[in-house]
Amino acid sequence: MKVRLGGRRGTLILAVGLMAGLILGAGASARAERSHPLVKLETSMGDITLELYPDKAPVTVANFLEYVKAGFFNGTIFHRVISTFMIQGGGLDAQMNKKPTRAPIKNEADNGLTNDAYTVAMARTGDPNSATAQFFISTVNNTFLNHTAKTPQGWGYAVFGKVVKGKEVVDKIKAVPTATKGMHENVPVEPVTIVKATVVQN
């Protein structure tokens, strides 16, 4: 059956239909954005909210959320702070004791995400597939950490989210005075604690 749209009335109907389509499209886009998990880090210097990307880093996000839900990060500190590089935490308590973790996960740094300022990525050793619980938030664009090749030198560091709220808190943390404590360098003089980590949207 053919539908004829003629004259002013037809134009109006067509315009309304197009507008409705745009609104529905925008709503679908907003829902897609809201579907990303959100994690709030309540720190001793303020709250930081992270948006995670399970579509880009499914293994990494699932691993991080497991630690959050288990309360693993509660009471840990940002133990390594370099203002022109990153703030790292999620593995040590205020006495610099390393918490026991689950098994390491595979490196998903080849997911196309880059280590830009305010992104969150997994910390690891020289072994590309050694990340467990520790993570870092970049304070600058750290392009040298990006994936370039599937080699020990080129694997890079897996980005799995970004700061969507509390960038000013990250800026405050990166500016704290640091010192060497035992074998650890760049440790905040006054502990910066992750009081609690919670999933605010799953």
Task: List the predicted regions and their residue ranges.
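Cyclophilin-like peptidyl-prolyl cis-trans isomerases
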Residues: 2-7, 13-202
